[in-house]
Amino acid sequence: MIDKINNQTPKYLLLNSFASNPTKRNDYLSYRYHRTRKTERREEIQALAGSVIGTTVALLSFAKKQKTNPFKINYGLMELIGVSAGAIIGGVAGGVIKADPFDKKRKVNEGIFQFANASIPPAVVLALETVTEKSKMFNTKLGKIATTVAGLAGGMFAAAKVSNFIADPGDFEKDRKLTMKDSLANIDDAIGVLAMSDFPVLQKIAGPTLPIIYALCGFRAGESN
């Protein structure tokens, strides 16, 4: 038997424990992948198709508005929110097809978490940058880097709090916690901030990359249970 499962638990201990304790294995799967059972292939295909369609619709809409290539969109905060929302709504919409009420609720809740995690951190960074631009002390390259890091970190935890409150205002269930996988997935926030930057080279990197990352966020929401 092992202690509480976390990111530091050795894999061999997990495997040994799973062999004699199926409940512990389910706890690990729920912690690691935010699901209580293995996702069916049908659900994965539906979630992926939905997220790709949602991302594409959002991209085409902004591209038409800006009269440019979908992968050369000039990203501001509204574009970041719009594309992430399209991807996540699409992923959830695809994932809930033929899902039971319990799974539907979980997919919607994960969608709320993913959207908050994709939109709140860049908004916090933008707000901080607006304030620090007026300060000679912080309006430097080092100051902007510090502002970005602080904004992303603070925004991630704020997003978790907001999404947990929306999904479960009565606090009847255990909160959805940030995990290492979520932190790595937050590269979309870092790239999103780059997309709003004044550096053309960084914008070129962000433009083609953001839709792919947001589509993956939508897929994660749609296949979650």
What are these model-predicted stretches?
Residues 1-225:
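Glycine-rich, hydrophobic membrane-spanning regions of integral membrane proteins that mediate transport
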